[in-house]
From Swiss-Prot:
Consequence recorded when altering M12A: Results in nuclear accumulation
Motif Nuclear export signal, residue numbers: 5-17
Annotated function: Tubulin-binding protein that acts as a negative regulator of Notch signaling pathway. Shuttles between the cytoplasm and the nucleus and mediates the nuclear export of RBPJ/RBPSUH, thereby preventing the interaction between RBPJ/RBPSUH and NICD product of Notch proteins (Notch intracellular domain), leading to down-regulate Notch-mediated transcription. May play a role in neurogenesis.
Region (Interaction with RBPJ/RBPSUH): 128-156
Subunit structure: Interacts with RBPJ/RBPSUH.
The protein, known as: RBPJ-interacting and tubulin-associated protein 1
Motif Nuclear localization signal per record, residues: 92-108
Family under the similarity heading: Belongs to the RITA family.
Coiled-coil spans in chain: none
Keywords: Cytoplasm, Cytoskeleton, Neurogenesis, Notch signaling pathway, Nucleus
Region of interest: Interaction with tubulin: 156-269
Keyword Transmembrane helix applies: no
Region annotation Disordered: where it falls in the sequence: 66-105, 141-269
Amino acid sequence: MKTPVELAVSGMQTLGLQHRCRGGYRVKARTSYVDETLFGSPAGTRPTPPDFDPPWVEKANRTRGVGKEASKALGAKGSCETTPSRGSTPTLTPRKKNKYRPISHTPSYCDESLFGSRSEGASFGAPRMAKGDAAKLRALLWTPPPTPRGSHSPRPREAPLRAIHPAGPSKTEPGPAADSQKLSMGGLHSSRPLKRGLSHSLTHLNVPSTGHPATSAPHTNGPQDLRPSTSGVTFRSPLVTSRARSVSISVPSTPRRGGATQKPKPPWK
């Protein structure tokens, strides 16, 4: 009689032997065609690989080969020897020519519009679109004309153009007025009679700009304004700048006094 410990040890040894025998027949060495192309020609000559079969043929061959492998496995159980089939070439290899390439395909609506002219004209669209939808899509590519024809409200479009002419001189007049103010403030450091004459001339220039922007200016400016002018800005701005240049040249020529000079009130106060 064997002790339970000895029985357990012998059972473990027999299980290990059975596991080794079962693992031996499952491992099979098949011919590989990778080393020939990647690592040079092999030591022994091997047959050329045949053409591959389609996937559905491979599945059928696999189901048939399962029974053959099972019968071979039963025969190999008794001997527990690994017999690699090196001479047999597998039939599950790809074919060189692909006979199952798809010929027909669904139509695409992107490549025709991006990479070429459409053969069916501009009205070509997807089948799921209605005629109204196609017309709406075409309207997105249309650019409106500069002036609407036959519109019910043309006034809002022309109103800004009409308002520009009267508002132009009034908006641009603060520029010469600001220049005159700067000149009058800058000339306060000079002598008193020069400042008074300059202030009177500046007020004389500013009065027609506020009262009558277009008609009173030719009377004050003299024969230089006999030529036609398109707007009030074009013939006033050069006169003011020329006057300002003459004043800026004449002001530094007068001797400046120290802090004893009293600043008179500007004409606008």
